[in-house]
Amino acid sequence: MLPPKHLSATKPKKSWAPNLYELDSDLTKEPDVIIGEGPTDSEFFHQRFRNLIYVEFVGPRKTLIKLRNLCLDWLQPETHTKEEIIELLVLEQYLTIIPEKLKPWVRAKKPENCEKLVTLLENYKEMYQPEDDNNSDVTSDDDMTRNRRESSPPHSVHSFSGDRDWDRRGRSRDMEPRDRWSHTRNPRSRMPQRDLSLPVVAKTSFEMDRDDDRDSRAYESRSQDAESYQNVVDLAEDRKPHNTIQDNMENYRKLLSLGVQLAEDDGHSHMTQGHSSRSKRSAYPSTSRGLKTMPEAKKSTHRRGICEDESSHGVIMEKFIKDVSRSSKSGRARESSDRSQRFPRMSDDNWKDISLNKRESVIQQRVYEGNAFRGGFRFNSTLVSRKRVLERKRRYHFDTDGKGSIHDQKACPRKKPFECGSEMRKAMSMSSLSSLSSPSFTESQPIDFGAMPYVCDECGRSFSVISEFVEHQIMHTRENLYEYGESFIHSVAVSEVQKSQVGGKRFECKDCGETFNKSAALAEHRKIHARGYLVECKNQECEEAFMPSPTFSELQKIYGKDKFYECRVCKETFLHSSALIEHQKIHFGDDKDNEREHERERERGETFRPSPALNEFQKMYGKEKMYECKVCGETFLHSSSLKEHQKIHTRGNPFENKGKVCEETFIPGQSLKKRQKTYNKEKLYDFTDGRDAFMQSSELSEHQKIHSRKNLFEGRGYEKSVIHSGPFTESQKSHTITRPLESDEDEKAFTISSNPYENQKIPTKENVYEAKSYERSVIHSLASVEAQKSHSVAGPSKPKVMAESTIQSFDAINHQRVRAGGNTSEGREYSRSVIHSLVASKPPRSHNGNELVESNEKGESSIYISDLNDKRQKIPARENPCEGGSKNRNYEDSVIQSVSRAKPQKSVPGEGSGEFKKDGEFSVPSSNVREYQKARAKKKYIEHRSNETSVIHSLPFGEQTFRPRGMLYECQECGECFAHSSDLTEHQKIHDREKPSGSRNYEWSVIRSLAPTDPQTSYAQEQYAKEQAWNKCKEFRQFFATSEDLNTNQKIYDQEKSHGEESQGENTDGEETHSEETHGQETIEDPVIQGSDMEDPQKDDPDDKIYECEDCGLGFVDLTDLTDHQKVHSRKCLVDSREYTHSVIHTHSISEYQRDYTGEQLYECPKCGESFIHSSFLFEHQRIHEQDQLYSMKGCDDGFIALLPMKPRRNRAAERNPALAGSAIRCLLCGQGFIHSSALNEHMRLHREDDLLEQSQMAEEAIIPGLALTEFQRSQTEERLFECAVCGESFINPAELADHVTVHKNEPYVYGSSYTHTSFLTEPLKGAIPFYECKDCGKSFIHSTVLTKHKELHLEEEEEDEAAAAAAAAAQEVEANVHVPQVVLRIQGSNVEAAEPEVEAXEPEVEAAEPEVEAAEPNGEAEGPDGEAAEPIGEAGQPNGEAEQPNGDADEPDGAGIEDPEERAEEPEGKAEEPEGDADEPDGVGIEDPEEGEDQEIQVEEPYYDCHECTETFTSSTAFGEHLKTHASMIIFEPANAFGECSGYIERASTSTGGANQADEKYFKCDVCGQLFNDRLSLARHQNTHTG
């Protein structure tokens, strides 16, 4: 019987529910689905049907009705199924959902249908449930309902009835927890199955608390509630615990009926709480937030984020079950019973119908509260101790063993628990003794306790709405959150509230008290205080830390010492280390700059650490602000501000002298960016003498040298020392030119350096030279950054001679040496000391050719320049040549030219330097003659008083043109100034097409340093830039295609030679090294002007608009075309320096010098020497030589081109090497010459087809590829076009060669004693070279791959020979059988058979020893014993042949003339074995096999061994083995990794067959793996697998 469905108005039945019990299926719905809005399809009901949980108190019949309804909804029999199917399905499902404790009993009964099953279950309940007057409802739901109605409070009977029905449905879910059922189809993993039974002792819990519970109620229905309570307790008391299961079930149901009420919407409340309906509420589904005090409070229970719904009650029930009934297995009992504890209407009916968890929770609380009030409740030991109850009260909220609700454990943010208890607990909570709030009453209840059911444990405040109570609890949680450092996992609502309420108080500025939501905002705010404090510190010159430490310490206290990061430079603080790292980049730049910075600091010995105290930091920087502008002195707090500020000075003149000691400001215009990158570190090395900061310690040391030499300029008649520094790193576009002020007669020293490091490298010898008066010293140095690597080689100075020349290293260091020699002039008058130092970006380490201009007292000067050919040529530097100047120790000028660019040949200084006639002047034009001539013609820079100053006209590369206190960029040709280098660049293009007229009054010194790709360079500069590609190494007289090659070479031989070669005459053009001791020696005679680089034909042609290639003379209208063209020459082969004693200078057309000195404009063909008056004619002429190598100086002893008077250059390549006179490209195999490389390629194919690559004959031939063969133009040492340098094999294209070269990777290069590798003509190989020799023809190879290909030819021949030999053998065998059959049988049968095993046994040993023979001495010894072992049989060490010698001797009368037909065919093999017969000798050398020679007899009397190294013959294998030892140290035999190498054959004789069968029995053995093959071809193919 179903109980009457008394539904109050506040609990309307859902329209979607088919009946009252369908609401129970809400447990199966998804947590986020709201009942009434869920899906209605069959699958939805199917899931509900499958996941229905059996609730014991609902009753079996009700459960059956529920299942049928769900199944109908699911199966829809009107359309899909029949009734019988439904019945079976229901039965199956019913059997699945019955309690586990009943399943065995029910299954034993085997019910046939659902009715029988229900009957069994009802009988079971009646069987184990004792009869009682007051609890007749125990046997059936109707009785239970009736009893509850009778005992229900009168104030809300109807409502309570409805609530009871709903609670029954809740109980039906709770009493049979899902955990008890094994729902395999349930996707939501339920908790382990549990037993819902309660211990028997639980029944007495309410027996003792019954009266106390009634007394504790403070509303009208107290008596009624007490009566219902008494009834329930009576039921428990009357029942005897005869059956444990029955007692548990009975007790459980009664306790649940007295517990909290299950709201009518309890079922679907699970669907709306945001947690899984089973996985999170698997233990107590009915109590999961669907429990409410009244139906009206349904909506509030659906809220999410409410913490007291499931968790607290579930934990309470769990603890109750644990503490009270240790044997309880009811997972449902530990389900959240939050809602039940918050519902005020707790009539007896409701108590009965309330879910188990809620009842247990309420009972537990009642028990405690009764005892807590010390009255009413008879709390005896049968229940649980008072202490345990109190403990549970205090700790149930913090229960974390997973039994309670997820919300309680994780989502509840309150620090103290709050909980909705029963009616009794309401009263107790109002008295502030209970921390658990009570559910509100219904409207019919007059007591105010019902309106304020939720009491805060912290402050005692009560709330009627749970949401308000939760928010109130959040406030306490937030307040205590940071105090205890605890983190709470709370619901979304709590998170949002906390985020909004916590942020404002978290980050507070300790200085001003301002608060921030984020630490980043606080950090930004603190910057204001930090900067203000910095200013204050600066004003007070305090030496303390920038930021006050208290804030930092306080923050450390808050966040921990490891959680706060402070910038040691500006004292800004950060919460994260990553933020600090990003911030520090402002101070120190990127990591790379930091690394360089610290490296430089270590070199200097002072490591800059921003972390130390500020006083040290300020001491380092002179108590100034960290970043100071070196131009205007303005200081900045941050390097970025300084960088921005420095941009202002790039438009002006950054070279203002700021101090007397050091007036240098290193802010180069072109490299400003690079400079600025390191400006934040510029104060790392603060020189005490000035305001300059040096980025590197090396710069500091060099700069200190400047100060040690500055005394020369300061206080000795020099008012200024202007050092213009600008790195040359990009394209050496230095357009710096010093125009000495005409109004300045005072002695000045202008040091113009394109490299900031240049000024740091002022000569170290300057202090030595103290002269009476120095009119002017112009030091022009175009140095690159890499130039710092070069070393200074200035020789010891001789002050008394004062004619010291500085050896310029390839950097600004040559400045030091230049100035050392340049300012040493000591005489009555010193017209000028011109020190021109052109340093390129990768300056070669060749020694600078310093031309010394010596003048006697009469004004005579001699410019000494060594010739390439050790010939000193003395040419009058001016109309009045100085005679005897070499003996005069007073020199008018010391012209020290240091050209350390990649092409320093072009230094021919002393143009006007030798023309001093008391009032004469040596005007030394800079590297660009044309530029200087223009300046000279316009009298812009050189017309100063008495011609006492000479102008250093540097190259107009677009670099800053410095005019003291003038505009930054000045045109060197016309004097026009520009504010931007780009404007000057555009302007210079106008001059690039103009050619100034030469002047006869000055001897020209062509000093050019030009980047070939610089589009801003003039025509003459372009020519020189191309010539730079032919860098010449003075040390080894070698050409290099690029400055990088030369620099690399010089790194090796940089310091091997002396820098003071005085009279050897081997100094390279512009690189002659004259130590300072040289100047003043008697050897210096007349002025010698070196003209190695005097071949700029177009330099002085003002009408020529064509850019001429200095290498081949081709003209180009566009500079970029010339640049591209020069790339071809940059890869041309060069002469190996070791083979020749003199450096071969690529001297361009002598027309340059002819123009300089005769005014003629000639364009000379560098190839044949023919000259032309215009470059266009030369252009046409050069097409003939376009593919030729310009200079093949293999036999050239003289690379110097004589100065005036000069004749057209002869083709010295043809003179030195007549073989090259006809054509430059020559076949290395046959010597045939070709005009173009393509013809040679076609010709080489013929050689490859004929296999005529004779490498040993190609040693003296040189391939000079042309334009079309740029791939081959690596070096002149590469003799073949695409020839492998290891094995000599040639290839058509470089790709094939590249693939081939990988085979030789990591192979050593060493020659044998009698072997010469033809691919390397000038340089010995550097490792061991394996020796491979063809056994068939005796040809030698240095790599197995070549031998492999070579052997293929022999294999083809052998196959043909074997075929022919097979036929001949057959005929021979027939003939032998006819004439001497007995002899043949005897030879091949008995004796041969007897000797063969020993031979074969010895042969593997010999072959096994062959690899050792190749590698070491055991060769011969291993072979010797084997041979000797076989000798008794064969009278020789030949295993295969001489073993048969006794037989041959014995049977010679009969079989002497017998020859095997295959012997001839195999004869090449024997010879093929011979080359490695060093190791393989026993197999074939000197052995006349039975098959050998068709027309020859078997030669066994005199065996011999031929040595292929020395062609010596031995008759004994022992002697031969000993002889091989002599070659072991010279030749390394590579063991058996090529075709035919060390491959012997094993010949097996047959007694039953003749020679033909012997051929069939012959096997060839691989010496690598020992595998046998029938023919040599198979062996060769097999060995190819070993060689790869």
Swiss-Prot record:
Top-level lineage group: Eukaryota
Instruction: Return the Basic and acidic residues bias intervals.
Output: 143-152, 161-182, 206-225, 295-306, 588-607, 868-881, 1071-1082
Q: Positions of the region Disordered?
A: 128-230, 266-306, 319-349, 588-610, 838-930, 1056-1104, 1393-1495
The record's principal subcellular location, in a coarse class, is: nucleus
Each sequence repeat occupies one of these ranges, namely: 1397-1403, 1404-1410, 1411-1417, 1418-1422, 1425-1429, 1432-1436, 1439-1443
| GO terms classed as biological process | apoptotic process
Q: Which Gene Ontology CC terms are recorded?
A: cytoplasm; nucleus
What SMART domains does this protein's entry cite?
SCAN, ZnF_C2H2
Q: Which SUPFAM superfamilies match?
A: beta-beta-alpha zinc fingers (SSF57667), Retrovirus capsid dimerization domain-like (SSF47353)
Q: What molecular function terms (GO) are annotated for this protein?
A: zinc ion binding
Domain remarks: The SCAN domain enables PEG3 homo- or heterodimerization to control gene expression in a combinatorial fashion.
Q: What does this protein do?
A: Induces apoptosis in cooperation with SIAH1A. Acts as a mediator between p53/TP53 and BAX in a neuronal death pathway that is activated by DNA damage. Acts synergistically with TRAF2 and inhibits TNF induced apoptosis through activation of NF-kappa-B.
The record's family statement is:
Belongs to the krueppel C2H2-type zinc-finger protein family.
Subunit structure, interactors included:
Homodimer. Interacts with SIAH1A and SIAH2. Interacts with TRAF2.
Q: Which named protein is this?
A: Paternally-expressed gene 3 protein
| Biological classification of the source | Eukaryota, Metazoa, Chordata, Craniata, Vertebrata
